[in-house]
């Protein structure tokens, strides 16, 4: 089963969003600060962080890039 998942802050603004497949995070996900700027983004495979993950500064500019390797 596949579904779009959105998490919200108490004030109703979007906290994070991405795809859930068979109960696990899958594909591209992104998280936001309460002011709407992007905080982090990256990909999941079967619930595991993989590939390039980007952390953004308070202005939404790229702050750090981390390459995640699949375990196993």
Question: Model-flagged regions — what are they?
Answer:
Residues 1-72:
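Glycine/tyrosine- and acidic-biased, solvent-exposed loop/turn segments at the edges of beta-strands
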